[in-house]
């Protein structure tokens, strides 16, 4: 799981830094394992574009597309109970500063904000990465796929089959 360094420092307390996460993934790759990255939970904040552009630059600097099975994007989503807990306990967090909308009993960003974030971060990747790495949206509204990643699926099973095929192809190439 990767995030912008500022979000790791301010929101993901007691976790590895971005650099440590990249080094750990590189060590796994060096030991013969393909890797995958979840850029998740993406958090809308001042300077988010620069923060996530840096994440992408570290991925591309330290890995080739052949090293990576998949990269997913996802945003912060809360249940009502978690959001109430944060507010009543006055947990210091930038998360409470963001505009959240209710959808399917949970709270998250609007589709417009998600579309902007996913499209922008995807655009930071080189064409080589876009062509050779399987990108997907993790548990996000299906209407976001086409405008953000340029493709869509007619069903969950179609997505799952495409993802499995991409994984197996990458793993086969990795061990060859």
Predicted segments, located by residue:
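Auxiliary Fe-S-binding modules of radical SAM enzymes
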Residues: 60-176
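Conserved AdoMet/S-adenosylmethionine-binding subsite of the radical SAM
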Residues: 1-104, 124
């Amino acid at each position: 799981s990767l995030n912008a360094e500022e979000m790791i420092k301010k929101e993901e307390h007691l976790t590895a830094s971005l650099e440590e996460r990249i080094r750990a993934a590189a060590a796994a790759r060096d030991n013969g394992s393909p890797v995958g990255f979840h850029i998740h939970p993406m958090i809308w904040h001042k300077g988010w574009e620069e923060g996530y552009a840096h994440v992408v630059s570290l991925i591309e600097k330290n890995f080739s597309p052949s090293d990576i099975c998949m990269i997913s994007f996802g945003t912060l989503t809360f249940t009502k109970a978690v959001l109430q807990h944060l507010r009543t306990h006055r947990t210091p967090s930038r998360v409470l500063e963001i505009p959240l909308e209710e959808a399917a009993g949970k709270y998250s960003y609007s589709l417009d904000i998600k579309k902007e974030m996913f499209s922008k971060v995807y655009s930071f990747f080189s064409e080589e990465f876009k062509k050779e790495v399987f990108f997907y949206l993790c548990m996000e509204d299906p209407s976001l796929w086409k405008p953000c990643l340029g493709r869509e699926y007619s069903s969950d099973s179609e997505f799952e089959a495409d993802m499995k095929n991409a994984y197996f192809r990458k793993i086969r190439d990795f061990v060859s």
